[in-house]
């Protein structure tokens, strides 16, 4: 919904959690699981690459969602000026970013963002450190 949706970080996180749960939220099926499955299946990778987007190898785009099959596997909804909703299904993780980039398209920020998310996921997989203090 380019320039047509206004949501708080919490609301976007709820949408992400619903997508993570294959369309379920608040104890009920909100959208059919088959619709979510279709969204996250992604589009034609070769057509995506032929479109000239070179910084997202292996990704695809379908039905307003960007799909990354590379580790850590994710799908994302990206809005103008840096608004982002990332879902990492293998890690049960939803990340919301509300940005204020000076340009409406901030695609090159996806590279450092995805690296940061990969580092976050690696850290979350490690056991918690204890300091010995109560």
At which residue positions do the language-model features occur?
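Structured C-terminal helix/loop/strand segments within mature extracytoplasmic catalytic/sensor domains
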Residues: 74-134
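Solvent-exposed loop and edge beta-strand segments that line ligand/cofactor-binding
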Residues: 1-6, 77-78
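Active-site-proximal alpha-helical segments within enzyme catalytic domains
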Residues: 4-24, 83-99
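Stable alpha-helical elements in mature extracytoplasmic
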Residues: 8-12, 31-35, 113-116
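Structural helix-adjacent loops and short alpha-helical linkers that scaffold large soluble proteins
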Residues: 23-31
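Active-site Gly/Thr loop motif
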Residues: 37-94
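Non-transmembrane alpha-helical segments in soluble domains
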Residues: 13-20, 36-40, 64-66, 121
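A general structural signal marking secondary-structure boundaries and capping sites
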Residues: 22-23, 43, 124, 128
